[in-house]
């Protein structure tokens, strides 16, 4: 073994995280007597702490442990190694100090000190921060979500402890501005009052004239504008989103997203619900949750009914014109889709993706217009791809090259959409079936069957 290998440790393997449960259930909790099982796991990423190569240099048999109380997240950092490399004039970064830079100042490095703090914090019984926001159950296990803001001192203290999971489990994840009062935090507790996950949400305030309010004329003076009545609305942006590894694989992420979305949607002051820089895994979760929710709202049946009467080139409802070859949809669809996007409070790109996946689900439905529906689905999807990538596509050259690239992109998207849709296709098809209940008097709709 060469010296480089002998004194080098993979940081992802060296760092272990331990969630130490507290004893007891119900309103009060005491320090664990060691009979409960601890959760031990490794991070996915350590490059924000230990550099791009994620290695720790200068130690043999190096082990670093971040222990946290499972309910309060009080942190303790301990280290073990068999030997340390020392050269005159050469020094290595202290891996403990590097980790402590990402943790709150209260982090203990002595286990006796940490146990003393645990006793003090849990002495009067454990109480979750914030107020109860909602509940959900998975496999007969109940989970409670609490909402709070960083203006609350206890919530801020908990957030400073929790935020270490962001760089360790979210690629390119970064800390938020703790002094910004627009941040909300949603914390998920299990029946034992252990934290199983959390999400931070940012509130963007902006003003939109309500339907009942008259808009100021274009030539209005500043004084007139200042007197103009407006209704405050906000955009909820889901930012950090973490389900801790011991509790993953149970569907908790989808349940939390569904709870957040449904509650935000029900708030009349919320104009739009967005997600900040989602990972591929979160994109899949979000797509499937949104598709299930749209199916529950009956949106697939609305799309299907429109496809029976109005082509992709339609300028108004019932316009069945065909034959145009340009990648463009009629003005009616542009307006119809925007009205429904606003109705369902989804961001532009997300609503477009969900609509396109529902279109593809409609292609599996037998109907007199099925052949045209297939062509229309391609037109809708290619249109969005073309608009979003216009500059790149125009650099390809002539029309043949552009159309070829669009077809290639469409086929790739169709394959990815099928992968995403597979677990929730049944929900979407159920949404399509709603047309029979909604249009009991429509004989053509009655004849349509889901294959």
Swiss-Prot record:
Keywords: Acyltransferase, Chromatin regulator, Cytoplasm, DNA damage, DNA repair, Nucleus, Transferase
Sequence segments annotated as region (Interaction with histone H4 N-terminus): 52-54, 202-204
Active site: 276
Catalytically driven reaction(s): L-lysyl-[protein] + acetyl-CoA = N(6)-acetyl-L-lysyl-[protein] + CoA + H(+)
InterPro entries attached to this UniProt entry: Acyl_CoA_acyltransferase (IPR016181), Hat1_N (IPR019467), Hat1_N_sf (IPR037113), Hist_AcTrfase_B-typ_cat-su (IPR017380), Hist_AcTrfase_HAT1_C (IPR013523)
Annotated site (Interaction with histone H4 N-terminus): 183
GO BP: DNA repair; subtelomeric heterochromatin formation
Residues that coordinate or bind acetyl-CoA: 241-243, 248-254
Domain of life of the source: Eukaryota
EC number: 2.3.1.48
Localization per record: Cytoplasm; Nucleus
GO molecular function: histone binding; histone H4 acetyltransferase activity
Quaternary structure, from the entry: Component of the HAT-B complex composed of at least HAT1 and HAT2. The HAT-B complex binds to histone H4 tail.
Protein function: Catalytic component of the histone acetylase B (HAT-B) complex. Acetylates 'Lys-12' of histone H4 which is required for telomeric silencing. Has intrinsic substrate specificity that modifies lysine in recognition sequence GXGKXG. Involved in DNA double-strand break repair.
Protein name (record): Histone acetyltransferase type B catalytic subunit
The species this protein was found in: Yarrowia lipolytica (strain CLIB 122 / E 150) (Yeast)
């Amino acid at each position: 073994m060469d010296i480089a290998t002998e004194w080098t440790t993979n940081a992802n393997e060296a760092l272990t995280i331990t969630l130490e449960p507290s004893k007891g259930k119900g309103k009060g909790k005491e320090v664990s007597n060691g009979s409960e099982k601890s959760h031990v796991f490794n991070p996915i990423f350590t490059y924000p702490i230990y550099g791009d190569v994620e290695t720790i240099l200068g130690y043999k048999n190096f082990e670093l442990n971040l222990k946290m109380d499972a309910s309060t997240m009080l942190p303790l950092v301990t280290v073990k190694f068999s030997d340390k490399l020392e050269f005159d004039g050469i020094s290595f970064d202290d891996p403990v100090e590097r980790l402590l830079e990402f943790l709150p100042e209260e982090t203990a490095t002595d286990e006796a000190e940490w146990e003393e703090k645990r006793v003090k914090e849990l002495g009067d019984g454990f109480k979750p921060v914030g107020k109860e926001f909602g509940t959900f159950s998975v496999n007969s296990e109940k989970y409670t979500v609490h909402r709070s803001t960083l203006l609350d001192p206890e919530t801020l203290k908990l957030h400073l402890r929790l935020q270490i999971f962001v760089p360790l489990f979210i690629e390119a994840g970064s800390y938020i501005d703790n002094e910004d009062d627009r941040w909300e935090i949603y914390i998920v507790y299990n029946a034992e009052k252990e934290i199983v996950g959390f999400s931070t949400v940012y509130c963007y305030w902006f003003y939109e004239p309500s339907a009942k309010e008259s808009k100021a004329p274009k030539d209005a003076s500043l004084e007139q504008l200042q007197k103009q009545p407006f209704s405050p609305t906000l955009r909820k942006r889901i930012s950090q989103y973490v389900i801790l590894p011991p509790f993953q694989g149970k569907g908790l992420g989808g349940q939390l997203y569904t709870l957040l979305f449904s509650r935000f949607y029900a708030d009349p002051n919320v104009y739009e619900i967005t997600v900040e820089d989602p990972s591929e895994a979160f994109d899949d979760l979000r797509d499937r949750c949104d598709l299930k929710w749209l199916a529950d709202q009956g949106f697939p049946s609305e799309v299907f009914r429109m496809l029976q009467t109005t082509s992709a080139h339609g300028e108004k409802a019932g316009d069945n014109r065909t034959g145009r070859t340009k990648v463009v949809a009629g003005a009616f669809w542009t307006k119809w889709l925007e009205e429904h996007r606003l109705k369902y409070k989804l961001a532009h790109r997300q609503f477009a993706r969900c609509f396109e996946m529902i279109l593809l689900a409609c292609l599996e439905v037998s109907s007199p217009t099925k052949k045209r529906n297939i062509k229309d689905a391609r037109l809708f999807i290619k249109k969005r791809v073309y608009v979003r990538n216009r500059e790149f596509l125009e650099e390809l050259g002539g029309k043949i090259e552009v159309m070829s690239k669009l077809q290639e992109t469409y086929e790739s998207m169709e394959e990815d959409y099928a992968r995403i849709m597979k677990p929730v296709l049944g929900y979407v098809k159920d949404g399509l079936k709603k047309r029979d209940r909604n249009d009991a008097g429509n004989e053509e709709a009655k004849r349509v069957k889901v294959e």
